């Protein structure tokens, strides 16, 4: 298993064995919530479109793809001397307050803050300031030099495209029939006390989940793209994503101050239920599923001569 260069709460490295059988075959994988990029690193699609609303995350990935050795050279001294609260807060002030900071320098600082902050949490205040406290590490955090190089190699070999934007804008790049979508949005809370659902500077609410489910259906019906999602296993999740076939899994939670108290939680992997004939949810008006989405798909099949040998037309 290839490890992420970041510490990332909710990262998929631990559940890749369960997730991989559900990821569809396609030429290109589109991820509107790339996060720690474990799915990218541990799959074999020819191309990738990887997006997130967090500009610091996408900046890091772009710089690692373009300038991996420079990122390593700038980050190494930060890791060598920065394992104290005082150094961390000073570097956080530089990250938040220095105008004109070069992209590669900001990328190196973001990597440092992620690895030295509290449990890899990435959090901002409403003004966009990074506000994660120091993590109080007993030993110096791991410097992911090998992971940086692995990421750069994979990103360049697959010509990965990194986009900074909302899931709505990311899904607009869907233009072909050889693309699959995997979505790992901020999880719906399992309780009132477990409500970490931040999406960069704003909460990712139930309303956003409903919008996401609707847009995924629309993209599938328009292009036939297969869709897979991950989320917490709650009644709300099952109601919002009822068009998906949900597979239950157990996952070790990682956002906790005490590793001994981290318990397994129920999650779901959702695979959009589609017609085997046309690959669309609810059908695309093909002979297997009947009229559901208008005449476009059926007429295209007729025009292409799909039924000529059957003597129907």
Pin down the residues of each PLM region.
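Short, polar loop motifs at secondary-structure junctions
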Residues: 33-38, 147-148, 231-235
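Conserved Class I SAM-dependent methyltransferase catalytic core
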Residues: 209-252
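Class I S-adenosyl-L-methionine
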Residues: 245-274
